[in-house]
Amino acid sequence: MPGVVFDLDGTLVHSAPDIHAAVNRALAEEGAEPFSLAEITGFIGNGVPVLIKRVLAARGETPDGHRHAEMQDRFMKHYEADPTALTSVYPGAEAALRHLHSEGWRIALCTNKPYAASRQILSNFGILDLFDAIVGGDCLPQRKPDPAPLRAAAAALTEEVVLYVGDSEVDAATAEAAGLRFALFTEGYRHAPVHDLPHHGLFSHHDELPDLLRHLLA
């Protein structure tokens, strides 16, 4: 059977509420005003270092390396304490994963979220055992949209045909750069209109995913 690689945030899980809470807890420690959920959701997609850079820039800061590292460490302290307190698996996502797994698909994760937090999220939701490989944002020097992490995840599956499933501009660009067919989840953290993102198929509910992936193999 072929392989499939999934993004995490905005694709399998709605994690923005926990990311939002951790950012605001980190800011509260220095007496700063909180951000709205919509603002933080708009900062998600390129990994924690870029998230923190965007948070600080939105506050009018141009941080040096020390300030950025300090804020990132504070954020991660709060986030890793419980990354699933407010996070939820998208409806139908677990069932789709289990269906694909039962059919013999090999499944990997490629995310810009750090490896440990990604693994903890999958474990907390009882789906870690469905994944054959995880490539997190701190596993390689490169992060998406550089194709290296996706290529590493695909290579770990050792299948001739590998598809990629994601929700954002970053995911679409990564798939295109890696030369993989891309299935776009339309209900995640995308900013641009669907037609602006290169994709080979799209879905709005994970119930549709197994049939879509089979169609992309045809």
Swiss-Prot record:
PANTHER family: PHOSPHOGLYCOLATE PHOSPHATASE (PTHR43434:SF1). Specifically catalyzes the dephosphorylation of 2-phosphoglycolate. Is involved in the dissimilation of the intracellular 2-phosphoglycolate formed during the DNA repair of 3'-phosphoglycolate ends, a major class of DNA lesions induced by oxidative stress. NCBIfam families: HAD-SF-IA-v1 (TIGR01549), PGP_bact (TIGR01449). Its cofactor is Mg(2+). InterPro entries: HAD-like_hydrolase_sf, HAD-like_sf, HAD-SF_hydro_IA, HAD_2, HAD_sf, PGP-like_dom2, PGPase_prok. Keywords: Calvin cycle, Carbohydrate metabolism, Hydrolase, Magnesium, Metal-binding, Photosynthesis. This is Phosphoglycolate phosphatase. GO terms for biological process: DNA repair; glycolate biosynthetic process; reductive pentose-phosphate cycle. One of its GO terms (molecular function) is metal ion binding. Belongs to the HAD-like hydrolase superfamily. CbbY/CbbZ/Gph/YieH family. Mg(2+) binds at D7, D9, D167. It is an enzyme of class 3 (hydrolase). It catalyses: 2-phosphoglycolate + H2O = glycolate + phosphate. HAMAP family: GPH_hydrolase_bact (MF_00495). The keyword Hydrolase applies. The active site is at D7 (nucleophile). Gene3D superfamilies: HAD superfamily/HAD-like (3.40.50.1000), Putative phosphatase, domain 2 (1.10.150.240). One of its GO terms (cellular component) is cytosol. Pathway: Organic acid metabolism; glycolate biosynthesis; glycolate from 2-phosphoglycolate: step 1/1. The keyword Metal-binding applies. Its EC number is 3.1.3.18.
